[in-house]
Amino acid sequence: MKLIPIILNAKNLSGMAGSISICCWIVVFVPQIYENFRRQSAEGLSLLFIVLWLLGDIFNVMGAMMQNLLPTMIILAAYYTLADLILLIQCMWYDKEKKSILQEVKKNVDPVHLPPANPINETVLQDVFNEYEPLLPRIEEEDSQSYSSLELGRTIVVKERENFFNDFLIVSGVLIAGILSWYISYCSGLDNGIPKKKPAFEQINLPAQILGYLSAILYLGSRIPQIVLNFKRKSCEGVSFLFFLFACLGNTSFIISVLSASWLIGSAGTLLMDFTVFIQFFLYAKPKYEKILIDN
């Protein structure tokens, strides 16, 4: 394969954006699936959000097949549906485990009976009189706890910086992979910006277009339950930041590369919804070390 210089025109920029979009959508579900597995919980995710997204992907697959799109596009749509199913299974499985644990706890816990109050005797009065003596080790213990909390807080700050750096590397790697994959096809002559003979006009498949619009509506509406859940909890804990970041990047690059009304509505609309979730991430974000200091 011979390396050739890139001609920066609208077609090549569109192809590059499309390649980046595909790479983002390939990995978009991985961070959230991993987050659920790591926490052994999907409590932060709205079940309705996953269900609506799944229905949108199902209509997307059906529309792509009816419109006779490229096999790669159909395979990608099927892959998204499979990833949705994995998230849905995680939500249902971890919720079932949580309920079973709560039921087990209720069975094993006996009613609490308060013991009768101990009478104040001479020993108690003596302890009160000499209170300054037992307070000394208690003060030292509190100082020790405060110091350990500060140390833990510093450790968490370092860990958060490491996570940010790791996220930056992951996002950069996906973007570079998208550009490189496009450049390989560009050098191979598959996408070199040279005008090709236009294919004959393809008749629009009305049922496929209807499915495309339905898919767009479902994509657009799927974010609303998640936004509402985050608002009620005043937290985005349990939701992967990279999940929505890759969704934003995928939709943004897709909008740049495609000019099809039904799919643009879905991408542009969900992009606005994803930005709303981003605002919630920063609005509800509280440094973990502050929580620890407050608790202690």
UniProtKB/Swiss-Prot annotation:
It is a multi-pass membrane protein. SMART domains: CTNS. GO terms for molecular function: basic amino acid transmembrane transporter activity; L-histidine transmembrane transporter activity. Induction: Up-regulated during histidine starvation. Up-regulated by addition of ammonia or amino acids to a nitrogen-depleted medium. Down-regulated by excess lysine. Residues 1-12, 66-68, 185-199, 260-262 are vacuolar. It holds the Pfam family PQ-loop. Residues 10-76, 208-270 form the PQ-loop domain. Disruption phenotype: Decreases histidine import into the vacuole. Resistant to fluconazole and caspofungin. Suppresses CDC13-1 temperature sensitivity. Its main location: membrane. It is found in: Vacuole membrane; Mitochondrion membrane. One of its GO terms (cellular component) is fungal-type vacuole membrane. The chain crosses the membrane at residues 13-33, 45-65, 69-89, 164-184, 200-220, 239-259, 263-283. One of its GO terms (biological process) is L-histidine transmembrane import into vacuole. The keyword Magnesium does not apply. Residues 34-44, 90-163, 221-238, 284-296 are cytoplasmic. Keywords: Amino-acid transport, Membrane, Mitochondrion, Repeat, Transmembrane, Transmembrane helix, Transport, Vacuole. The keyword Repeat applies. Belongs to the laat-1 family. Amino acid transporter that moves histidine into the vacuole. May also contribute to low affinity arginine import into the vacuole. May function as an amino acid/proton antiporter. This is Vacuolar histidine transporter YPQ3. It comes from Saccharomyces cerevisiae (strain ATCC 204508 / S288c) (Baker's yeast).
